[in-house]
Every structure is written in C-alpha cells, then in structure tokens.
Amino acid sequence: MGVFSTLGNHDYGDYVQWPIDGISKNQNLENLKQVHADMGWRLLMNEHVILEKNNEQIALLGIENWSAKANFPRHGKMKEAHAGTEKYSFKILMSHDPSHWAAEVVTQYKDIDLMLSGHTHGMQFGVELPGFKWSPVQYMYKQWAGLYEGDNQKLYVNRGFGFIGYPGRVGVLPEITVIELV
C-alpha cells in the first residue's frame, strides 16, 4: 500500500529568516517534498488516496498543517482533501496538529472515522504510569498523546521520536505506533 506522509508546522520554514545559504523558503519546501519522494513516500497535500485490500476500500486524506492555535499558520485545506470521499464508508485523516480535530473535524467532518496526528511530542517531558499520564503540554493541547474518542470519531496523537528545542526526553518515551485495521 505504501508509505504516506503530511507536512507539519516546522516543514514550511516559517520560523527562520530566508534565504539561508542561498536557498529561498519556497526552494527549501520544494527540496523537502523531493526528499519525501526520494524515500518513496507519498506526500499528501490537501488530497486523498483510496487504499484497497480484499475488495474493501478506505479513503486516506492528508492535509497540510492546520492548527487552531494562533501561532501556527494554516496551510491545510480540508475541503479539498475531503472532496470525492463521500462514497467511502471509512475515512482516515492525517493532520499534523491535534487541535484541528476539535476545531474543525468533529464539527464539520463527522464522517472522518480516525484522525492521526502528532505535533506535541508530549512536550518531551512528563510522567507516565499505568492509568496515569501527565505532561505540561496538556495545558496547551487537550489531546496530546494517545487515543481520544468523541461520538463515532477517534483521534490518535503520536508523541513521535524526535524533539523540538531540547534534544532529549524525560518521562515521555519516543513512540512509533502500529495501528491494525481489521
């Protein structure tokens, strides 16, 4: 079926002064898109693909970064990605920022069954014990790690394995998630 990806807030280079080493902001983004292609990844940019197995079909939607937080620009166009998916009974959305779920997905796109997100990194700091998880990121993001459910929709927020700022983690382990659809 392949590997699919979307862009997150840092991928656009909005936080630095351009040009850098003679490369423009737009060229940097194009270079990043090419890296995805060179790795064999299909970068979904406000679009969808249909995955098929055993005569079953799933619509996989991927949008550019969309955030409900004021600091992050909205590049994502959910309407474009969603167009043409109405006939598919199961839809998965890849959207980098989990704030997108409550702000738009659950209110305007009730037919999205599962949203896959990241962005928070669990703030790379927290406490996880059986039945208890805490991180200061929860004061900024209600959905910051793990599975969340609302009505007939689900959101999974992956804490990732990278970092932002401090190059380490305390109490919040890196994560690679495997989700099996049956």
Model-predicted regions and their roles:
Residues 1-182:
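Soluble catalytic domains of enzymes that build or remodel membrane lipids, polysaccharides, and related
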